[in-house]
C-alpha cells in the first residue's frame, strides 16, 4: 500500500467546482438526509412532470429500488433538446477514426437531427415503447445516435460490445427477446475489419433456434465492403433516414421506466442482463460526470471506453451529453498506428480530461516513455482511471509521465450494477494516494463486513458492501429478479454486496483489493491477488502481471504469477529469482511466488479485462475445457501460455 500522499494543488483547488470543506458538508448531508439531498440534486435534469416522491427503496425481502418515482422525463430530451436554445452550435461529439486522418465533429443541433431521424426509422418499422433493441456497433457516432434514438421513443436498448462472438450476441438477443438489431457492415480496429453484419446474420440464426425471431436489421455503412443481404429484413440506414422527418417528439417516460439492459458476466457463466431505469440513472450519471471530472463548460472530455460497456454508456454518452459536454469517441486502439496514439489524439483535439483503464496505462508504460514525450499534452488538466484497481507504479507513471505531475488522477471504483462512479477522489477536494480510490461519492455509504457479515469499523480489511441505495443503482436482472436478490442482497442481509474485497486505512481511504474470488488463501493467510500483482509490476522490468492460486499440497494454495516484461527484456531463471525476492521484500515471505511464467501477453477480453478464469485453469494444469473463449482479443496468447506452463512436474 503506497504511503505517498499528493495534496490537492492550490491551482487545482482554486479552479475546482468543489473544495474539501464543501465535499465534507455535502457528503454529511447526503448520508444524513438522502431524501433532501437527492430531492435537490434531482432537479439537475429537466422533468416534464416534477417528482414529489424522492426515495422509496428496500434492500430486504423482495428488494425494491425506486427514485423520483412519480416524475416524468426523457433521457434523449435531456441530452440534446434542452441544450439547443443556447448551445445548439457547440460540438457534442468529436469522432476520431481508427485511421488517424479521419475525424468528424457533430454539433448538438446536428445530433438532434441524426437522433430524430433514427428514432423515426425505428418507429416506421414498428418499434414501440418498451420494445428491446439490440445495438451491435463499433465506436462510430451512429452508436450514440442509436442509444439516444431508443431513449427518445422509450425503447429499451441492449448494447452488445462489437467484439463479442455471434454466439454471445445470439444469447443476449434471446435473453431480452429483442426483435430489432442495429449494426454496421463492418467495424475497424487497428486497421483490421471486424465482420459485424456477418456476425449478426449468424446470431439471428442462433436466436431463431431459441425461438426469438429478429424482424429487422438496420445497417450503417462504415467500410462499404460487400455483405450478404436479406431483403425485407435488412435495411440500409442511409436509405431509411432519407425517407423520414428530422423531428421526433420525445416520449414522456416515467422515472422508473427501463432505459437499458447491459449484460455483465456472472459467476455462473450465464450473463446477467443488468437493468437500469430512466430518472435516477441520468441524475447520477450526470452528477458524477460533472463533479468527479470537475467538468466545466468548454472542456474537451475523452473517455476511451467502448459504448459496449457501462463506462461507455455513463461516461461517453449519457453523463457528458446531459451536461452539454463535448465528448470524444475513439474508434481505434491505443497502439495503432503506434503506441503514441492516445497522446497524439490528446494534442490533436486539445483534450482537457482523459479517462482510461489501468490495463491500457500499463501496456503503454511498457512501450516506453518516448511515445509520450513526443507529444505536448499541455491541454490536459485531469486524468482518470477505471475498470480495475490501478497499481501504484502505473499510477505514478500516469501522474508524472503522462500528466507531467500537474494533473490530478481520479481513480474511480464502480460497477455495471452501480450505474455510475461510487468511490473516487474529487479533484479540488481529495488528497491523492496512488492506488487508492479514496472516498465515497455523495450519498454512498460503504461498509466493510467480515465473512460472518459482522460490520468492521476503523482501519480494516473486509468485504465491500453499500449500506443504502443511490439513484444510479440497477433495479433488477432483466427477467430474473430472484437472481438479482440472490447475487447482490442475500450474502449480507439488507446490504448491497459488491463482490469486491476492500481495505480501509486509518485516514478512511478505500483501497479495492480485487474480486473476493481473486483472494488467495496461502497457509491460512488471506492475500489479494491485486497486491501481489502490484508488487511484481513495481519491478522496473515488469510491464504487466496476473496472479492466480493453484492447489498446493502444503500451503493449500500456491501463488502462480504470469509476467509480461518491458519491451526489450528477456525472461531468465536469474530474473525469476530476482522477482521472488522483490515480492518478498514488497509484501513479506507469505507472498513468495511459487511459479513465475514469463508470457508475451495475457489473455484479455477486447475491453481489456484479464480473463483470470483461463489463467486459473492453466495454473491448475486443467486446460482441456477452458469454457467460453469467444471474447478473447488474441486467442494465440492462450496457446503460448499452455505450451510454456510451469506446473508440469506436479501434474506428471
Curated annotation (Swiss-Prot):
Residues at which Mg(2+) binds: 537, 539, 542
The protein's matches in InterPro entries, at most eight in alphabetical order, are given as: Ac_CoA_lig (IPR011904), ACAS_N (IPR032387), AMP-bd_C (IPR025110), AMP-bd_C_sf (IPR045851), AMP-binding_CS (IPR020845), AMP-dep_synth/lig_dom (IPR000873), ANL_N_sf (IPR042099)
Membrane spanning segments where?
Answer: none
| Reaction equations catalysed | acetate + ATP + CoA = acetyl-CoA + AMP + diphosphate
Q: Which residues carry this modification: N6-acetyllysine?
A: 609
UniProt xrefs under SUPFAM superfamilies: Acetyl-CoA synthetase-like (SSF56801)
Where ATP is bound, by residue?
387-389, 411-416, 500, 515, 526
> What does its PTM field state?
Acetylated. Deacetylation by the SIR2-homolog deacetylase activates the enzyme.
**Cofactor entry:** Mg(2+)
Task: Give GO cellular component annotations, separated by semicolons.
Answer: cytosol
What does the UniProt keyword field contain? Acetylation, ATP-binding, Ligase, Magnesium, Metal-binding, Nucleotide-binding, Plasmid
Q: Which GO terms describe its biological process?
A: acetyl-CoA biosynthetic process from acetate
- Residues at which CoA binds: 189-192, 311, 523, 584
Source organism's superkingdom?
Answer: Bacteria
Q: Tell me which Pfam families the record gives.
A: ACAS_N, AMP-binding, AMP-binding_C
Q: What is its EC number?
A: 6.2.1.1
Q: Which GO terms describe its molecular function?
A: acetate-CoA ligase activity; AMP binding; ATP binding; metal ion binding
Q: Which family does it belong to?
A: Belongs to the ATP-dependent AMP-binding enzyme family.
Question: Which HAMAP family does this one have?
Answer: Ac_CoA_synth
- What task does this protein carry out? Catalyzes the conversion of acetate into acetyl-CoA (AcCoA), an essential intermediate at the junction of anabolic and catabolic pathways. AcsA undergoes a two-step reaction. In the first half reaction, AcsA combines acetate with ATP to form acetyl-adenylate (AcAMP) intermediate. In the second half reaction, it can then transfer the acetyl group from AcAMP to the sulfhydryl group of CoA, forming the product AcCoA.
Listed name of the protein: Acetyl-coenzyme A synthetase
Query: Which species is the source of this protein?
Result: Rhizobium rhizogenes
Ranked from the top, the taxonomy reads: Bacteria, Pseudomonadati, Pseudomonadota, Alphaproteobacteria, Hyphomicrobiales
Gene name in the database record: acsA
